[in-house]
Amino acid sequence: MTTLPNRWRIALAGVVMQVALGAIYAWSVFRIPLTQAYGWSIAEVTLAVTIAIFVVGVAAFGGGLWMQRAGPRRVALAAGALYGLGVFLASFAGGRLWLLYCSYGLIGGVGLGLGYIVPVTTLVKWFPDRRGMITGIAVTGFGCGALITAPIATRLIAQVGALNTFAILGVVYLIAVMGAACFMQNPPDGYHPPGWTPSAAQQQQRSAKTYTLKEATATWQWYGLWALLFLNTTAGIAVISQAGPMAQKSRGSRLLPRPAWSE
């Protein structure tokens, strides 16, 4: 009899992965240092994270198809390598804005898109009895990425500069995501947690029709969900690009201390 891994260990690894990936929400703390150091406009700097988020949608789509064939671990390992590498290569941007776009925006965005879908998709399979709870935990981990990263990045920028901070964080992200990826695996077919018996409604949900891509895109619901996600993401990016400077300029802010370069 095959011994199954502890599902809570997989959940912890998933949260670690999401926290590292969610660090993209801390982008705004780089905005002022980059504009001051290289004379770039706010719009030019913000475009880097805009590219990353745009690429996320495409990469997540491809990653979902790949994960169906190869499993979550390979996808997560690739995500960690690309995400960490993209952020690390941003440290070589200097005055070359195009390199920032290609590294942080394109390469990092692909890694982020591949990685984001892995924990949520994997954990709901291990926690059919607590689908809502485990999804909330995973998504919360992503949201906490900025809460954890922003003050750390702010202090690093003040001490070693924005580019060196990219290098440090890139290595940390690579180790965190690829390390967590080693724990990602699907449960066996028909898996039920010990002592759990699905209700009639849950059994009906688990046996619901699975749509192919062609079938899904033939429904209005698919386009409605896409539009909803697009609007949600657009609003989020608008806030992300301004959150750090707003917090740094607000009196009494405790989340983001006022760094030396803002004085």
Q: Can you name each region flagged by the protein language model?
A:
Residues F142-D189:
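Helix-loop-helix hairpin linking two adjacent transmembrane segments in secondary transporters
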Residues Y25, I53-F61, A146-L147:
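Residue-level signature of mid-helix packing/kink "hotspots" within the transmembrane helices
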Residues T2-A13, R96, T210-L228:
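Juxtamembrane cytosolic amphipathic helices that cap and anchor the N-termini
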Residues A81-G95:
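C-terminal ends and interior cores of transmembrane alpha-helices
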Residues L34, G113-F127, I134-T135, A243:
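Intracellular juxtamembrane helix-capping segments at the cytosolic ends
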Residues A59-P72:
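Helix-to-loop junctions at the C-terminal end of transmembrane segments
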Residues Q18-V19, G86, L97-G113, F230:
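Hydrophobic core of transmembrane alpha-helices in multi-pass small-molecule transporters
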Residues W27-I32, K214-E263:
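Extracytoplasmic gate region of multi-pass secondary transporters
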